Swiss-Prot record:
Function comment: Promotes RNA polymerase assembly. Latches the N- and C-terminal regions of the beta' subunit thereby facilitating its interaction with the beta and alpha subunits.
Record protein name field: DNA-directed RNA polymerase subunit omega
Coiled-coil region list: none
Keyword Nucleotidyltransferase: yes
Domain of life: Bacteria
HAMAP family recorded: RNApol_bact_RpoZ
Keywords: DNA-directed RNA polymerase, Nucleotidyltransferase, Transcription, Transferase
Glycosyltransferase recorded as keyword: no
EC number annotated for this UniProt entry: 2.7.7.6
Gene that produces this protein: rpoZ
Biological process per Gene Ontology, one example term: DNA-templated transcription
Amino acid sequence: MARVTVEDCLEKVDNRFLLVMLASKRVKQLFKGAKPLIDNRAANKNVVVSLREIAAGKVNFEISSRKSR
């Protein structure tokens, strides 16, 4: 089994803090019943699945800009 590392994910997401937020949101989606975007034959935990999805470029995200009042 190949290990997924933060460095693998940082090739897709430049900011570590953004990576953590993205992975946690994806984990919540998986816990709520979303289907994995990658093959999960090894029955990995949702955290590992979300990181593998990010490293594979399967998870898309958009940064919204907030306007000051």
